[in-house]
Amino acid sequence: LPDWFVFQKLLAASISHSIVESGLDQIGGYVTEASSVVGLRTPADLLAAYGVDSAPEFADVVRFEQPRIATFSKPSNSDRPWRDFPHGFLLGGSLAPVWRMSRTRFSYGAEYWRIRSDGEQKRLSRYEGAARGWVGAKRWRPPSPIVGTLARWQGREYFADVIAENVLLTAIADEGPAGFEGVRPRVWSATVPLSECEVFERVFTAQVDGVPVRILRHAGENAEVLLLSDEPADAERVDAGRVEAGVFEAVVAAGRLADVHGVENQWVPSADK
């Protein structure tokens, strides 16, 4: 993986809908290098590179900077009921490298684009961090504290969006910390130097009926989980739904979570250079 660049992700219709309707702020799964697919100028060309023979009126993509702390792996070479990329490249002549990216929040400045069949491209929205979310989305969903970057600053923890040498901190509280600006009810934001922050993420994993999962959100008696297996039989066992190729999610009773483990991954800025 190169040191730093912009990714592009082809969006399943359900994900496009969730961005617009409910402010979906998480991303993962198959991603490719944006500069390697600039020649795929129509929905048909783009979908063909993913092994889909279709020519819809439009296709939606999101373009975003490499998220901090996200991890990348080669696609599976197992036999699956969907098109995979065992050689690590999209299909056809683009030779665009493709990776599977761990689940994280969108990086600040991510852009949601629509590519039309006549080749026109139009930016529909832009992600402006944990506090503000997607511009023009119908709803804002509070970020999950166990998906995406956090920061410690002056002894407190905040949601964090790293922007060059600064960090956009977000607090969700009845009253904002001193110097923070109110963005929406109970949501506060401030920009501070990166050098004053410790940036990290928390990842919780568990087992549900023997299937490995990552916990995405824990609310009351239920938990939203991402399967860490792309085996269809595992998805069926826990009644998980397929979000996109190779990605399964489920809402389960918290009591079904076994062998829960948490890890804190620190971001070292020099590691990205």
Where are these regions (language model features)?
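Short, surface-exposed polybasic-aromatic patches that bind anionic ligands, especially phosphate groups
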Residues: 1-273
